[in-house]
Amino acid sequence: MQLQDSIFIVTGGASGLGEATVRAFHGAGAKVVIADVGVAKGEALAAELGEGVAFCKTDITSEAEAQAAVDLAVSRFGGLHGLINCAGVGPAWKMIGKDGPHPLDAFARTVNINLVGAFNMIRLAAVAMARGEPNAEGERGVIINTASIAAFEGQIGQAAYAASKAGVAAMALPMARELARYGIRVNTIAPGLFLTPMMEALPQDVQDALGKATPFPPRLGRPAEFAAMARSIVENVMVNAELIRLDGAVRLAGK
């Protein structure tokens, strides 16, 4: 699938990996709906990029708001060819903290946003994609989810986050198998240590140390590199049901 004139929804598209993806895809000629809870940033980005970009306030755990994002893509741009799921949260809670056990509601919230929210967007977007006309390869759509290397090497305090991202990674294959009949691919990117807003909030010396933990290149990943990987997946029809670690060969040891 070529990006030119294709229509995408990017969740979490107002900042970080999502914003980089919106910018890259729009720059390549795609039409993009930014689906994000951050209204000010989302509207500002849509205004900056102009024609071919729309913002939709979207809590991905809400059936109504997720459907509204899909409906906006169809009504504003004429259909839907792709979904890039970047929205998520990354809290840290120890199993046994100074105030007691890991809060159950914190675990549930993390899984609800990162896993259930991603699933919610996929199930609704897939219906819209399946209604579209296939291209010459018989392809109607492509879905890319964002997992994390924490799904495989979760650190202390990441039980909820790791569980949610492992679920994201695990659902790609059964989804890809089921949606193959409609010409819809499903893939997953598992980023390593990237310079996202959450990372930028850390002191510079901490950022530098984390970057040096990556074998090569010995630095934090750039959001534009995530966007480039997403574009590569979109444009290569043979990439399906894959999980790609985008991590510079880092393997996090337990601490």
Task: List each language-model region with its residue ranges.
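Residue(s) in the substrate-gating loop at a strand-loop-helix junction
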Residues: S148
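Canonical Rossmann dinucleotide-binding motif of NAD(H)/NADP(H)-dependent dehydrogenases/reductases
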Residues: L3-V33
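The beta1-alpha1 cofactor-binding region of Rossmann-like NAD(H)/NADP(H)-dependent oxidoreductases
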Residues: V39-A40, T58-A68, L104
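C-terminal substrate-recognition "lid" of short-chain dehydrogenase/reductases
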Residues: Q2, R222-L246, R251
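Conserved mid-core segment of classical short-chain dehydrogenase/reductases
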Residues: G90-A108, V127, R131-E137, G157-A160, ...
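Active-site helix of classical SDR
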Residues: I122, S164, A172
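Catalytic Tyr-X3-Lys loop
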Residues: V89, G100-N120, I144, V168
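Alpha-helical segment proximal to the catalytic Tyr-Lys
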Residues: V127, A176-E178
